[in-house]
Every structure is written in C-alpha cells, then in structure tokens.
Regions:
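Bacterial N-terminal signal peptides that target proteins for export
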Residues: 2-10
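Hydrophobic face of amphipathic alpha-helices that form TPR/SEL1-like repeat modules
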Residues: 30, 61-68, 95-105, 135-142, ...
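Short helix-capping/linker turns of helical repeat alpha-solenoids
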Residues: 53-55, 69, 87-91, 122-131, ...
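N-terminal leader/linker segments that initiate helical-solenoid repeat arrays
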Residues: 16-68, 133-134, 212, 231-233, ...
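Alpha-helical repeat scaffolds
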Residues: 42-48, 74-85, 109-124, 148-162, ...
Length: 483
C-alpha cells in the first residue's frame, strides 16, 4: 500500500532525518577513513560523542589523536587511555599508547608507575600478538616492571608471530641494557635507529654524559646510509642534532656573559692569543654542528616531509640575517599544498619578521585571527609572539605572558618555554631569570626539548640559591596544576 505524504510533512521528516544524522556524527569506521585520507583532520568532536557512549575503541583513538597535538592535556590523555583499557577488559593496546605517552612526558613516569604495575597483572601477556606487543611497549618505558626472563620470552614470541612492520631491534636493545650487556645493547640501538624513530632519543640517553659528543659522531658514520633511512628518522635525527647545537650555542653565550661580568668595572684589556684561539675553536665547532643539522634536515625537506619543511622555515624566520625573504617564502609555498594550516601559521610568522621588507603587521594579525577562528592549537602562541615582538606597536610583554599562560593552562608545553624565554630575555618587570629557569624546567620535564638550551645557559649563570628556589617553584607548579 502506498501512502501519499503531504510535501510539508515529507520535508519535515527529511529535515529530522538529516538532523539525526548530523547529531549522530561519523561512525568509528568513517573517522578512521577520514584520518587515513587526512591525518590532521578535525575528528575530536565525533570521537568524544562515541567515547561518551562507552565506545572504548573510540576512546583509545581519541587519546591517540590528542597525543599528536601540542596543546593536549597529558592528564586528559592518561584518563582516556585508562578508561579505554578498562582494567584489562577493554582495549589492551591502550596500555601501549599510555606507555608511549609517559615515555614522551617524563614527569608522568613516577606518578603512573603504581597504576602501570597493576595494569600489567590484568591481562595475559602471552595470549596473542596484541597483548605481547603491548607488554613489550610497557617494557620500553618501565624496564624494571617486566622481568628480563619474561621480556626475553615475549620478544621471542613477538618475532615468531610478527609478519608485517616487525621492529624488534629496540626491544632487544632495552633488554640487553637491562641485563647489563652494554656492548650488545649499543649494537642493537645502532640498528634500531635505522628502523624505529623512538630509538634515536633512547640511544642518545644511553650514551650518557658524553652524549653530545658521541651522538653527532655516530650520525657522521651514518651519513652514507642516510638516503635509505625512513624520512621520519632523518627528521628526528636532525631535530636532536639541532638541540645539541642549541645547547652548544647557549653554553658559549653563557661563557661570554660570565667573562664580561667578571671584568665589569675593570679596564677592558684586549683578548689574549689563547682567548682568541679558544673562541675561534668554539665557533668552528658550532659552525660544523650547524652544518650537520642542515645536511640532515635538507634531506627530509627534499623528500617533502612537512615537519622538516616547517622546522627549516622556522629556522630561516628565526635567523633572518642568514636567510632572505624570497627563499623563505618559496619554502612556505611548498608547505601550503601539503598542509595549508601550518603554511598559514608560517606565513603569519613570516609577516612578523622586522628584518625583511615583507613585514606586514596587518596581514600577520589577520592570519592569526583566521587561525584562532579555526581552532588551530598554536594560534594563541602566535598572538603572544605578535605582542611580545611589538609587531604593530611597542612590545606588550604583559599581554604576551597572559596569552602564553592561557595556552600553558590548556596543556601546550611550548607555552611554558615561551614564558621562560620572555622572562629570560624580556625587559623591566618581565626580566626574571629565576622564573625563566622555573618555566624552562617545566617545559623540559613536559618533553619540550627546545627548552634544554635555555636550562643549560641559566644553570651556568644563576647562583645556586636561585636555582634551588626555581626548582621549588617548579615542584609547586606540578603539584598545583594538572600538567
């Protein structure tokens, strides 16, 4: 039987159906396909809806999506992963994601240790490949929570069962290190660096006190194989080398500052031949370190790897006397078709460079407002930079600090570093080296590697009492806030 529905009711029913579909959002399968097409797609709203309904797989994916964003709250991600794990009855791989988060966020390690210890007892580690690899991931972050004999057994099972994308090298390295077999561990770490980007920082840490000398030497040996390495690994190596060079530069600046202060008020004498030779040797070493960074980064840029392109563009913008506006703009133009949003952020920074004739405060502000309206995570930092540099008028450090603090409260680790630099190099009331050290340590402990150079510089210039006060303030921040 056919029912003739009046057009008005038909339109109303269609509108209701469309509204219901809109309210329902995407399914988990649709979200995964969206992320497959565009890893930076905005899907958190749909995932939150699914997670609120108790979908544990969506809860896990939401945590993973947030983990890729710089402004996400570590506390929220921890809660999502623990909810998805559901005491071992839910998504066991959530434990692996949580372990990776803790590995990137050092201050979480001790706080989460009791929970992780209990979680390991809530599922059989050798039940299937998924459980086995999850326990091995926890072993990477907490080697002491898995007995070496069990880790060796699980590693053997992993190697037997794994068919695709098998990467046992890092597990072997950590196991050998745990058992005190350092020569074997180093051999495995060197192999792991070639296949697993996470091994890069771990090998650097493994090298101990001489890491800033030994790791660059290792990368020089690796250069003949560089073209065959995964592009992510090349970029991570470049980023670590850049951090090492930044620390080297900061230590030289601190030495120069100390030397100037020690002769303040005294008759300024010309440098001795020994001083000139030492300064030349330091500058030559820094030039070599900078060239090494550029060689590695340029390979990743040539492959069209967006994070490397963004990193190089940021370097050019931060060093406008060494680069020109034309070559920087050309690089931003290459980023645009690959990642329009990040290109827009770079373009805003580009218009804030006062060394170039292309400086345009109005265009910079308009782009920042577009980014803020779209919910871009770094928009608040860009606006803070706009005020701290005084792009439109005189620098407004208080307004910049307020914006950076707001971003830090949201969980943006880079914001702590921005506050640290403003207190370290700012003028008048904003100049506060103790606060600078406090915030730089917070940033570093939250995983912001770029803060290491500022920490090292301040450690060489601040009195011991000031460092102790700064560390007490840092500890207080971690107790008071959910960082």
């Amino acid at each position: 039987m056919t029912v003739n529905m009046p057009p008005r009711l038909l339109l109303a029913s269609l509108a209701l159906a469309c509204a219901s579909t809109a309210n329902a959002g995407q399914s988990l399968e649709q979200i995964r396909y969206t992320l497959y097409k565009d890893p930076s797609a905005e899907v958190t709203g749909d995932l939150r809806q699914l997670a609120e309904r108790g979908d544990l797989a969506s809860t896990l994916l939401l945590g993973d999506v947030l983990a890729a964003r710089p402004d996400s709250s570590p506390a929220e991600m921890v809660a999502l992963y623990q909810k998805a794990f559901a005491d071992g009855r839910g998504m066991v791989p959530a434990l692996a994601s949580l372990a990776r988060l803790i590995d990137r966020t050092p201050h979480l390690r001790e706080a989460q240790r009791p929970w992780m210890t209990q979680a390991l007892t809530r599922y059989p580690a050798n039940l299937d490949p998924r459980n086995t690899s999850t326990t091995l991931e926890v072993f990477l972050t907490y080697p002491e929570l898995v007995e070496p004999a069990q880790a060796a057994q699980l590693l053997a099972l992993y190697e037997q069962a794994c068919l695709l994308n098998c990467r046992p090298e890092l597990y072997h390295a950590v196991l050998a290190e745990r058992q005190g077999r350092r020569s074997e561990a180093e051999r495995w770490y060197r192999q792991a660096v070639k296949v697993d980007a996470r091994a890069i920082d771990r090998y650097y840490a493994f090298l101990g006190e001489q890491q800033d000398r030994l790791f660059p030497a290792f990368t020089d040996q690796l250069e003949p194989e560089r073209e065959q390495l995964p592009v992510e690994n090349i970029h991570r190596i470049a980023a670590l080398l850049d951090s090492i060079a930044s620390v080297q530069r900061a230590e030289q600046d601190a030495d120069r500052y100390e030397s100037q202060n020690s002769t303040a008020g005294a008759e300024k004498l010309p440098p001795t031949p020994e001083q000139l030779a030492r300064e030349k040797a330091q500058q030559d070493a820094l030039d070599l370190a900078t060239a090494r960074v550029q060689r590695w980064r340029d390979v990743a840029v040539a492959r069209g790897y967006v994070p490397a392109m963004v990193s190089k563009a940021n370097y050019m913008i931060s060093n406008p006397t060494e680069h020109n506006a034309e070559e920087t703009q050309a690089l931003i133009d290459q980023v645009r078709p690959r990642d329009p949003t990040r290109a827009k952020a770079l373009q805003a920074q580009f218009y804030m460079v006062n060394n170039w004739l292309t400086m345009d405060p109005d265009k910079a502000r308009a782009l920042i407002e577009e980014l803020r309206a779209s919910g871009y995570p770094g928009a608040g930092l860009l606006l803070g930079e706009y005020y701290s540099k005084g792009v439109e008028d005189q620098p407004d450090q208080e307004k910049a600090l307020a914006l950076f603090q707001a971003e830090a409260n949201k969980g943006n680790t880079a914001a702590w570093y921005r506050m640290a630099t403003l207190h370290a190099y700012g003028r008048a009331l904003c100049h506060d080296p103790v606060k600078a050290y406090t915030y730089a340590r917070v940033a570093l402990d939250l995983g912001e590697r770029s803060a290491k150079s500022l920490v090292r510089r301040l450690e060489k210039t601040l009195p011991k009492d000031d460092i102790e006060r700064a560390m007490a303030a840092r500890n207080g921040l971690f107790k008071e806030a959910t960082l």
